[in-house]
Amino acid sequence: SSLNPEDDQAFGFRQELGLLAVSHRKAFVSQASVSHLEHLIQSFSTGIKTALPSFFNVLAPKTTAEHADQTFLVAGAAVESREFPLFSYDPNRGLEWGSRFLVSANPQPEQEWPIYELDVCSEDGTESSLSLAFTPADFMVLSADAKNYYLDVPAQFWSEDSLLPLAEYLRLPLKDTHDKLPFLWTIDEQRVLHRILPNIMLTEICRERLDAWSFVQDFGGSNNYHAKLAAEQARAEAELETEKKIAELEVKHQAELE
């Protein structure tokens, strides 16, 4: 898995091998990572036992000998950032297509990005908490050449009007982003927080990965568009029925008073 912003595959031309294998429908497919061993082992066990063909797309990052201990860190960060989402597809799970595709092994599968709380303390001793989304841009910070893709913003230029957390920025319609800039929180060796701006290429990679993750979510039912639409329709119908009953009771009550 590569997040090189200069790679054409980063901009919507990536071959999603796991999803391509799912398109065959009559095969067991697992997209797994060495960082999530329980999911990986379960996938191997199921795939080996099934009579169907099996396909395993496993993330095992290549690291140098001196950084071998970072293999699990990089693999885990790739999963967390939705750069390499986990899933399994098993035709034997049921006749309904939705029952065959599972994404529950992913961190916070119902969310766009995993959200974590970071406790911070200001220079005057005030304590607070930051809600941080983990995106592909956060994953890319682990790269040796990360400095090529970010710009550190001096604190005196921090503006709440023009600087938005990347996750919030990506939710905006493109027409509303002309006067906004996305940023990430990072921390230096002195444990001082910084805001850094990802370049446009990396920002668009995040947008593409969010779109790919939404596709996987929809397949897995963790954030299904049609399910949400049906729930909203049922809620609206229930509210309408409640309003109707209240109106009938008010009319009845008024008639009794008269």
Where do the language-model regions lie?
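Conserved thiamine diphosphate
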Residues: S2-T50
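Flexible, low-complexity linker and terminal segments
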Residues: K62-E258
